[in-house]
Structure formats: C-alpha cells, structure tokens
C-alpha cells in the first residue's frame, strides 16, 4: 500500500491524501460503509458501487468467522470474489465484537475465549489465529487483534489492557511475517492505539504503535459511550504522536459532526454503523440537519427526500412516500433511507477533501457543523 499526502490544512490538522492498494485508489478523508457479514445491509452491490460509490468498505472478522465460516471464503477465493466486490475491503480484527459480548467471553494473555451469539459454541481468538483468519478473508487492509475497553473504565484496568494489546500486537506482527498471502493481492496491516480516556495512556500507546513501523495506524476504544469532547481530546493527543506520513483510521466513528471534528484533528479514515442503523429506524442525515421520517409532519410533504440529489433516491422519492413506507413497515423504505444516508456520508467526506485541497476547510467545517446541528 502506498500513502501520498497531498495537502495539509493551514488552520487545522486536516489532510487530503491517497492510499493506493492492489484494488485501487482510496481518496481521503474517507468514510467506509460497514458491510459486517459481507454485505452493506439492504444495498445491492450495483447501488453501492454506482450510486454510493465508496473506494473501500468494511467487513467484520468475528461475524465472517462464524458465518459463512473461513473454509467457504477460501473456496470462494476470498471475500472480494465471494461478494463480487472489486474495490477495497478493510477487516477489523473482532476485538470490538468480543468486547461487546461481555458476559459471554473470557480474556486472558493467550487470547479471548468466547461463546458464539448464534449457537452458543465456544471459540478462541488469539493474535495468531486472527491474523490467519484475516489472511483467509483477504481484505486489503487488516487490523491487529486488540482489547477494546468499555466506558467508563478503571485506570488500572485500562493500563493493563493497553499493555496486553501491545503484547498482542507484537505477536500479530511476528505471526503475520510467517503467514503467506492467500490470494493475488497484498494486504496492509494496521495496529490499534488503546488507552481508554486517559491522556497518559493514549500517549504511551500512540508512541508504541508509532514505533511498530506499520504502513498505517488506527485508533480504537472510542465512540463507546464517552462524551464527544473526551473523544476529541483523545484523538488530539494521539494524532500529535502518530506519524504524519501514514494514514490514521478512527474506528467506529461516528455522527456527521464527529467526522468533521476528527478530520480537523488529523484523521483520514472512518467507519460506523450509524448511517445504516439509523436509516433502518427512519433517521435521515442531511446537510441541514437530521430528519425523523416517521414523524407525522412528513405525511403530506411531497418535496424530494433531499433536493441536493446526492443519490438517485433523493430526487426519485418524496418525503411523504418514504414516511408511508415506514408506516406500513415496507422493506423498500429502509433501503431508500440506507442509500440516502450512506450517500450523504460519502458526500460529506468528499466535500471535506475538496475544501482541504481548496484551502478553506476550517471555514467550511464551522459552517457545516452549525448547519447540521439541527432537527428538521
């Protein structure tokens, strides 16, 4: 993978760059739609590629390990071929999903023993087998195995967990070097900064991760319930220490405003289930604020869903029609809302890139944050 830093904003730490992999160019800042089990929920690959048009999507190691299982993916020739996707894929390591199981997992130095949420069977993830699983999935960007701590988190626990994540990172790197590629494209490996909401721990972790010398770096353990200001403070501390000449990925973030604020702090890559999950519940994001399409006020509003027309659904359907689809629990309503929200998120990060390159990102961001902080 090759990272080219094209321009840095003069008023903030925002950057415009490109990542080049064997599956194409990723223009940053970028939002990555979440395709947990090998699909972005409710979206055909044709719509995803032609209308939403992301350079990269995310898939989940934990879920793909359980279903369809790794032998099926290997027989298919990897996830790209299995899901008929010829652009970039990033896989997370399963650390966050294991964290979210809480009552059904046991964390030890060796790894994590957990109970499947599907059938109750017991499995173990270690730094070594997670690297092997991600080789078999075949994503372009793969993540280190880490422990994601909850919020709030006791300082001593956060410190012990961070050091274990660092030891796991060393094991990931050692094993990855011994594990050959399974397919005809290369894979880039990103370690993950942890440390909960403690600045000293975040600094320690960022220094350790920076010294690992990986091709890119990620920040984990945020967007787990902490206030936005704490998230920004941790991102700020970490971005001061991570190398400028490598991409920075903030995992699991966030709202449109979160994304713009973190771009200003120096983040290049984002993923989050919010645009798809909220869409399925009738919440739409727009440049002028959010819309709860289930509200009665939209029942006779025949204006387009979004007059900006970012994706085809925005001008083909009215708010009244979409409200009707949700009222009768029609699946099409969830699909329309999902395409709209993902299209908006991709538009937002592309606009951020455009304004970084133009040199007026700070002014544009301030306007957009104020404009989007609104319920329509």
Residues covered by each model-derived region:
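A non-catalytic, amphipathic alpha-helix used as a structural packing/dimerization or gating element
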Residues: 129, 133, 137, 160, ...
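C-terminal extensions of enzymes
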Residues: 1-20, 26-32, 41-42, 146-153, ...
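Short, solvent-exposed loop/turn segments at secondary-structure junctions
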Residues: 33, 63-65, 96-97, 149-150, ...
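Conserved, mostly hydrophobic/aromatic
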Residues: 24, 57, 92, 134, ...
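Glycine- and acidic
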Residues: 151-155, 159, 216-222, 331-334
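Structural signal for hydrophobic packing residues in well-ordered secondary-structure cores
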Residues: 138, 169, 173-176, 180, ...
């Amino acid at each position: 993978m090759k990272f080219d830093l094209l321009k840095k904003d003069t008023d903030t730490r925002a950057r415009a760059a490109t990542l080049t992999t064997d599956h194409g160019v990723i223009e940053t800042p970028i939002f990555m739609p979440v395709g947990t089990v090998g699909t972005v929920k409710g979206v055909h690959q044709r719509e995803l590629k032609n209308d939403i048009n992301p350079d990269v999507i995310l898939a989940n190691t934990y879920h793909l390990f359980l279903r369809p299982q790794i032998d099926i993916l290997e027989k298919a020739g990897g996830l790209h071929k299995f899901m008929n996707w010829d652009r970039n894929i990033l896989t997370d390591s399963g650390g966050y999903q294991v964290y979210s199981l809480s009552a059904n997992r046991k964390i030890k130095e060796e790894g994590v023993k957990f109970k499947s949420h599907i059938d109750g069977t017991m499995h173990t993830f270690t730094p070594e087998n997670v690297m092997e699983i991600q080789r078999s999935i075949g994503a372009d960007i793969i993540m280190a195995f880490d422990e994601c701590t909850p919020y709030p988190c006791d300082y001593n626990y956060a410190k012990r967990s961070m050091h274990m994540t660092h030891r796991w990172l060393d094991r990931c790197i050692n094993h990855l070097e011994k594990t050959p590629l399974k397919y005809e494209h290369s894979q880039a490996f990103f370690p993950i900064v942890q440390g909960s909401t403690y600045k000293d721990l975040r600094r320690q972790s960022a220094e350790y991760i920076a010294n690992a010398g990986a091709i890119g770096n990620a920040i984990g353990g945020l967007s787990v319930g902490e206030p936005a200001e704490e998230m920004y403070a941790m991102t700020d501390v970490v971005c001061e220490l991570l190398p400028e000449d490598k991409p920075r990925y903030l995992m699991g973030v966030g709202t449109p405003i979160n994304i713009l604020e973190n771009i200003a702090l120096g983040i290049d890559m984002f993923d989050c289930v919010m645009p798809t999950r909220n869409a399925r519940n009738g919440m739409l994001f727009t440049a002028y604020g959010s819309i709860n399409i289930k509200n009665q006020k939209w029942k006779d509003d025949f204006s387009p869903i979004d007059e900006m027309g970012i994706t085809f659904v925005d001008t083909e359907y009215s708010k009244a029609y979409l409200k009707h689809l949700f009222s009768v629990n029609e699946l099409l309503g969830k699909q329309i809302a999902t395409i709209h929200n993902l299209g908006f998120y991709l538009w937002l990060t592309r606009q951020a890139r455009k304004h970084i390159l133009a040199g007026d990102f700070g002014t544009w961001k301030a306007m957009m944050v104020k404009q989007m902080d609104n319920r329509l």
